[in-house]
């Protein structure tokens, strides 16, 4: 038995088999054609209404002039349709050359690989073959020089052609040609047997436009060649492979605007939740426990703070009630006129409280100085020990600094002094300064009168009118008052209390709302504290 009997039948025929089958089909068609029909035009005189339309209607002749229609015998004169079909070409073996498709629009010298054998590397049979040897240095230099000259020539021609005005081309050297005429004789060629002709290139006009119009349409070159198919033929996919290749669409877990129906297994597979194990960190438990403990301690602290606040509020309330009871008891005793033995103690306690309050103010002042800015601190320390007269008497002239001790001259040469027994034994009378200090009119005017030079910018030109204006005049005066009394021009003046108003007010403050005045009198050392009041 032959080996071909075991092999399966081929699914495709080879090129030789296809050509043989085509030839056999053509021979069978020729054998089956029994009658060969040949069409001829009607004879002359019977061609009325006949119009030639096919090539067979013309026969072997040309057009019919008596028939006035467009005629194309042998398709002469007919416009051919444009077609991109290529003519079939065959190789020396008679096979169709399919590489003509890849060679369309390419030069004939271009190497195009269109066969499978072109991908297989050639086997080197002889390593010493001269065609396989690398060229030497001289050949490389020669080829390089030729390439450079050719490129320079091409580039120079294109650059010169693009320029509107160019220099004249360099003329070729003259050529000398020896000419021997065919007609020899005295009558011909001036009797000369030979002539030497000097051939010179004709000068070209640089501004001359081109004489010939080149409008040749060059066919467009083919695109990149198709990629060779290097994979096995496609085979039909099985149902299992089709199901495996079904990729679920990208559907969000929150939005599904198109309303796709996604199986739950596909959605979980796309989500990837089951691909990893969930591991809870132990720090979460520690954090929860710490938060619980902190919350419990905070609640306990709040509860204890609330209890302490309630206790303090209760004590404060009791203390306030006790104070109110004491004040009520003292008020009842004052209404009843009952003397208390603690009045003296209250006066001493009040003095101690005043001293304590003054010391507290001094300490507060020292703290403020320590916390103040450097510039402000220096200013406060400078004004701390100044005399009160320097602070308030801003208009006095600046006293000259001298090392001599100054005395009040009014204390000398007085009739009342240590030898006069202090005004007849009245040691409580304070009349040492019985006259005004520097009571001159000029000094009073300089202190209590604004300066024109300094205050003119503030008050303007009506300074005199403002000074003369009585700004502190009452609308309604007392009866019996002297309106013609001249106003004072000096400093503030004081007078003694002639009616004892200060004593009366002091007793009223001491007894408060008591109906019966107390028999106790003020101490003697406080008797003359309020004997002077301010006079305006």
UniProtKB/Swiss-Prot annotation:
The modification Phosphoserine is found at residues 14, 182, 190, 224, 232, 234, 446, 479, 481. GO terms for molecular function: nuclear receptor binding; nuclear retinoic acid receptor binding; nuclear vitamin D receptor binding; SMAD binding; transcription coactivator activity; transcription corepressor activity. Residues 174-339 are annotated as: SNW. This is SNW domain-containing protein 1. Disulfide bonds: none annotated. There is a cross-link at residues 81, 97, 115, 122, 141, 158, 170, 193, 240, 258, 286, 339, 344, 416, 441, 452, 509 (Glycyl lysine isopeptide (Lys-Gly) (interchain with G-Cter in SUMO2)). Residues 467-489, 503-530 have a biased composition (Basic and acidic residues). GO terms for biological process: cellular response to retinoic acid; intrinsic apoptotic signaling pathway in response to DNA damage by p53 class mediator; mRNA splicing, via spliceosome; negative regulation of DNA-templated transcription; negative regulation of transcription by RNA polymerase II; positive regulation of mRNA splicing, via spliceosome; positive regulation of neurogenesis; positive regulation of transcription by RNA polymerase II. The modification N-acetylalanine is found at residue 2. It comes from Mus musculus (Mouse). InterPro entries: SKI-int_prot_SKIP, SKI-int_prot_SKIP_SNW-dom. Residues 59-79 are annotated as: Interaction with PPIL1. Identified in the spliceosome C complex. Associates with U4/U6-U5 tri-small nuclear ribonucleoproteins (U4/U6-U5 tri-snRNPs). Component of the minor spliceosome, which splices U12-type introns. Interacts with SKI, SMAD2,SMAD3, RBPJ, RB1, PABPN1, MAGEA1, SIRT1, FOXN3, U2AF2, PPIL1, DAXX and ATP1B4. Interacts with VDR and RXRA; preferentially associates with VDR:RXRA heterodimers. Interacts with NCOR2. Interacts with MAML1. Interacts with NOTCH1 NICD; the interaction involves multimerized NOTCH1 NICD. Forms a complex with NOTCH1 NICD and MAML1; the association is dissociated by RBPJ. It is found in: Nucleus. Residues 1-44, 212-233, 311-386, 467-536 are annotated as: Disordered. It comes from the Eukaryota. Transmembrane segments: none annotated. The lineage of its organism: Eukaryota, Metazoa, Chordata, Craniata, Vertebrata. Belongs to the SNW family. Keywords: Acetylation, Isopeptide bond, mRNA processing, mRNA splicing, Nucleus, Phosphoprotein, Spliceosome, Transcription, Transcription regulation, Ubl conjugation. Pfam families: SKIP_SNW. GO terms for cellular component: nuclear matrix; nucleoplasm; nucleus; U2-type catalytic step 2 spliceosome.
């Amino acid at each position: 038995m032959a080996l071909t009997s075991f092999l399966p039948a081929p699914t495709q025929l080879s090129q030789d088999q296809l050509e043989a089958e085509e030839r056999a089909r053509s021979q069978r068609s020729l054998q089956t054609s029994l009658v060969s029909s040949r069409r001829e035009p009607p004879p002359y005189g019977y061609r009325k209404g006949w119009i030639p339309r096919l090539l067979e209607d013309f026969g072997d002749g040309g057009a019919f002039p008596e028939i006035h229609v467009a005629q194309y015998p042998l398709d002469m004169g007919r416009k051919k349709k444009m077609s991109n079909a290529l003519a079939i070409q065959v190789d020396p073996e008679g096979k169709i050359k399919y590489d003509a498709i890849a060679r369309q629009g390419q030069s004939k010298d271009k190497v195009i690989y269109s066969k499978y054998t072109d991908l297989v590397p050639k086997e080197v049979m002889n390593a010493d073959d001269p065609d396989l040897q690398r060229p030497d240095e001289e050949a490389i230099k020669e080829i390089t020089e030729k390439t450079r000259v050719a490129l320079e020539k091409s580039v120079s021609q294109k650059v010169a052609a693009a320029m509107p005005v160019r220099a004249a081309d360099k003329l070729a050297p003259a050529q000398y040609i020896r000419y021997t005429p065919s007609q020899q004789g005295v009558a011909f060629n001036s009797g000369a047997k030979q002539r030497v002709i000097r051939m010179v290139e004709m000068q070209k006009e640089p501004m001359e436009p081109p004489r010939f119009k080149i409008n040749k349409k060059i066919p467009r070159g083919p695109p990149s060649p198709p990629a060779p198919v290097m994979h096995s033929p496609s085979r039909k996919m099985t149902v299992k492979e089709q199901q495996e290749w079904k990729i679920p669409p990208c559907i969000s877990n929150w939005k599904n605007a198109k309303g796709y129906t996604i199986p739950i297994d596909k959605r979980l597979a796309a989500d990837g939740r089951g691909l990893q194990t969930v591991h809870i960190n132990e720090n979460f438990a520690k954090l929860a426990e710490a938060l619980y403990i902190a919350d419990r301690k905070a609640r306990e602290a709040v509860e204890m703070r609330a209890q302490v606040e309630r206790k303090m509020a209760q004590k404060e309330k009791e203390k306030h009630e006790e104070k109110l009871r004491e004040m009520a008891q003292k008020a009842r005793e004052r209404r009843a006129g009952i003397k208390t033995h603690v009045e003296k103690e209250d006066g001493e306690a009040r003095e101690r409280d005043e001293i304590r309050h003054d010391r507290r103010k001094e300490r507060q002042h020292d703290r403020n100085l320590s916390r103040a800015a450097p510039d402000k601190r220096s200013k406060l320390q400078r004004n701390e020990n100044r005399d009160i007269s320097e602070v308030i008497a801003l208009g006095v002239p600046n006293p000259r600094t001298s090392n001599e001790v100054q005395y009040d001259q009014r204390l000398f040469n007085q009739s009342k002094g240590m030898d006069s027994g202090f005004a007849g034994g009245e040691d409580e009378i304070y009349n040492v300064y019985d006259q005004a200090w520097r009571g001159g009119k000029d000094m009073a005017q300089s202190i209590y009168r604004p300066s024109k030079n300094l205050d003119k910018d503030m008050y303007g030109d009506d300074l005199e009118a403002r000074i003369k204006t009585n700004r502190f005049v009452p609308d309604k005066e007392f009866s019996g008052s002297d309106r013609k009394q001249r106003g004072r021009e000096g400093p503030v003046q004081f007078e003694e209390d002639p009616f004892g108003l200060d004593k009366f007010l002091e007793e009223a403050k001491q007894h408060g709302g008591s109906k019966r005045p107390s028999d106790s009198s003020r101490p003697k050392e406080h008797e003359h504290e309020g004997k002077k009041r301010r006079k305006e």
